Amino acid sequence: MPFRTGEILNYRVAWAIFPNAAALQMNVVERRNLLGWQTWHFRASAHSQAPVRTLFEVDDQFDSYTDTTTLESHQYELYLSEMGSKQNEVLHLIPIGQSSRGTVAPVLVQPGTRDPLGAFYALRAMDWQHTPEFHVPVYDGSDLYDVRARQEAASEMVAVDAGNFQATKISLRLFEHGKEVPHTSFLVWFAHNPARTPLLVLAEMPVGSVRVELAAAPR
């Protein structure tokens, strides 16, 4: 895998007219046994920044426990704190036909289903030089999407806060019940380095345009 335990990546999030709307950190916390599965433990945390924070106080954390072999999701945890409202949820994803493990009520999903965070790391694991397209079911805790990823450019220069990099450009489109989700699309650039570091994400969503860029060299 291109990522390693202990990896921490920090990003600056720009939204609408706000160049520093939020800070995002992505972390490969550990490899661990979860109910008999060998898993990667991924974590993403997002915190709104001033002046946006005066309008939208957001402190969210997402944890993904992803199979080390198949990269399908076994457990997805959401710890949301948004504008005074808190919500914690633990989702135990079980492929149809398999038995549940543990005491958490299972969510039955198609084999190979990822959660959003685990899916992002799965995109890093792809060899985009030899796999131009990748389709995967993604469950976000509420809705199930068919995510279709495609290589748009094998190599191009990308400038972010962390520096200038050669990168592969990937487009992401979301489908639900066979129809493309309107006004929602993503572009992602992965560096041409052994870690395939995510450098930049451009998102078009109903809430507006979002730019997420690597803020500093990985550590």
List each language-model region with its residue ranges.
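Acidic, serine/threonine-rich low-complexity disordered tracts
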Residues: M1-I94, W128-R219
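Hydrophobic, well-structured mid-protein blocks that either form specific transmembrane helices
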Residues: M83-M126
